[in-house]
């Protein structure tokens, strides 16, 4: 979804500098990439506004990762063959803005 003329104007005339910020969106849809997700449509609008204001934004779909369940930061140390959570948590820690999204 494209930004409206008013949204573009507000972004372009903003006196604030957000260029040093990083945003991470976790799209908690149940649909794997590249399947269309309505949640992604909502993310795209917010992400577009952030990027127009100089914020670096990334979107991850946890469903695309192999995340082991448990209470330890890396479940491969506790019997799991694979756990992508350490990759995701590093991105979460590096982000200034974390946006959790889910289907309505």
Predicted regions and their residues:
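N-terminal beta1-alpha1-beta2 submodule of the flavodoxin-like/Rossmannoid cofactor-binding fold
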Residues: 1-104
């Amino acid at each position: 979804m494209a930004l409206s003329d008013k949204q573009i104007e507000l972004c372009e005339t903003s006196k604030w500098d957000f260029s040093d910020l990083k945003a991470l969106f976790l799209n908690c849809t149940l649909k794997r990439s590249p399947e269309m997700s309505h949640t992604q449509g909502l993310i795209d609008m917010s992400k577009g506004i952030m990027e127009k204001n100089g914020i670096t934004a990334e979107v991850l779909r946890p469903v695309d990762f192999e995340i082991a369940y448990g209470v330890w930061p890396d479940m491969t140390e506790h019997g799991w063959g694979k756990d992508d959570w350490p990759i995701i948590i590093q991105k979460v820690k590096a982000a200034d803005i974390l946006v959790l999204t889910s289907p309505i």
